[in-house]
A protein has these predicted regions:
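Conserved NAD(P)H cofactor-binding loop of Rossmann-fold oxidoreductase domains
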Residues: 55-60
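Substrate-binding pocket helix/loop in short-chain dehydrogenase/reductase
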Residues: 63-64, 71-74, 163, 181
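Active-site loop-to-helix junction immediately N-terminal to the catalytic Tyr of the SDR YXXXK motif
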Residues: 67, 112-120, 132
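Active-site helix of classical SDR
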Residues: 87, 122
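Residue(s) in the substrate-gating loop at a strand-loop-helix junction
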Residues: 106
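Active-site-adjacent segment of SDR/Rossmann-fold oxidoreductases
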Residues: 111, 132-143
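C-terminal helical subdomain
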Residues: 147, 170-222
Length: 222
């Protein structure tokens, strides 16, 4: 049994990951602003840690001319700076356990999307941060660092917010916006967060399942 901390655990993919890991009898710590936590001002919530999962995320959509600096900062803070702050804060515990850092990235890291400058930039940052952290932490400390990059997820708060924001910014109907996005997915449907969570739970059953993934970003859905 491992001690695993999941950020963004109150809903969406983070909650699905929390539930899947708890079902595998891990000791799981949910870390979320809805629980009174702040990933930009981390407080140590445990005395041992085997796995840190950086899953907290936010997306704000708008045209460049309308996008405020405040919105930019919010997206970059949660999606990129939060990874830096949480990993740095929990590094001593991860060094002690020779643990694992798993970052939830996105296919948006390498796929430009209209009205999504901040989100794409933040996920691009999270992508290269994952590779850089692996370079710095694996050989020096024995810490495995890798990422999972899902496509659009089904039924999450972020996905619903994306649909609503696309309607407002593009002037489309909600039905057209949803179909437009589905047309871009090879299997023609959004990925249920539970499937991603089950895959992560399998990888984290034993470090031998994932230690050779250090420095890798695994796509989930296309």
């Amino acid at each position: 049994m491992s001690t695993i901390l999941v950020t963004g655990a109150a809903k969406g993919l983070g909650k699905a990951i929390y539930n899947a890991l708890e079902a595998d009898n891990h000791e799981v710590i949910g870390y979320d602003r809805n629980f009174g936590h702040d990933i930009l001002k981390p407080e140590i919530a445990c005395d041992k840690l085997d796995v840190l999962i950086n899953c907290a995320g936010v997306n704000l959509i708008d045209w460049l001319e309308n996008f405020t600096e405040e919105k930019w900062d919010e997206v970059m803070d949660v999606n990129a700076k939060g990874i830096f702050k949480m990993t740095q804060a929990y590094l001593p515990l991860l060094v002690e356990s020779k643990g694992t850092v798993l970052n939830i990235v996105s296919n948006a890291a390498h796929m430009p999307m209209t009205c999504s400058l901040a989100y794409n930039a933040s996920k691009g940052a999270a992508h290269i941060m994952t590779l850089q952290l692996a370079r710095e932490l694996t050989k020096k400390h024995g810490i495995t660092v890798f990422g999972i990059a899902p496509n659009k997820l089904k039924g999450t708060g972020m996905s619903d917010a994306i649909d609503d924001q696309v309607v407002k910014t593009r002037g489309w109907t909600k039905e057209y916006a949803q179909q437009y996005q589905l047309n871009g997915l090879l299997c023609g449907e959004e990925t249920p967060p539970e499937r991603v969570a089950e895959f992560i739970a399998f990888l984290l059953q034993d470090k031998d399942h994932h230690k050779h993934l250090t420095g890798c970003i695994l796509p989930y859905g296309a």
